[in-house]
A protein has these predicted regions:
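Structural signature of eukaryotic scaffold interfaces centered on beta-propeller domains
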Residues: 32-35
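Serine endopeptidase catalytic core focused on the charge-relay Asp
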Residues: 9, 16-22, 37-40, 44, ...
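Small beta-barrel nucleic-acid-binding modules, principally OB-folds
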Residues: 1-14
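Short beta-strand scaffold segments in enzyme catalytic cores
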Residues: 23-27
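Generic, ordered loop/turn and secondary-structure boundary motif
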Residues: 28, 50-51
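Short beta-strand micro-motifs enriched in acidic
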Residues: 28-30, 84
């Protein structure tokens, strides 16, 4: 059980968008199923943290893991899977690194 709690804690991210806005999100691993044959790693957050303007091609997103000990960046390009919905207040971005 402690392992599960540690894994959950390590999945929480701090996200900074190109406009300087800051929010939180989660690192998620989507397991293979009928429609994809490989695990898909994504950042999932709210649309009010990263909206359609923040996930346009060329935009940069910085996220921090492990209480800001590890910083990574995503530069949005055509090869990434992205999804956002204002109605459902969700944004998903594929991680390739």
């Amino acid at each position: 059980m402690i392992t599960g709690i540690k894994q959950m804690k390590n999945s929480i991210l701090k996200i900074k968008n190109a406009d300087g806005g800051i929010g939180t999100g989660f690192y998620c691993l989507i397991e293979p199923n009928n429609w994809n044959s490989f695990p898909l790693r994504v950042v999932m957050t709210n649309n009010h943290v990263l909206d359609e303007n923040n996930i346009k091609i060329g935009k940069k997103i910085i996220y921090s893991l492990n209480n800001n000990k590890i910083n990574k960046q995503i530069i949005i390009d055509e090869s990434r899977i992205t999804y956002t919905s204002k109605k459902y207040d969700i944004t998903i971005i594929e991680i390739k690194e």
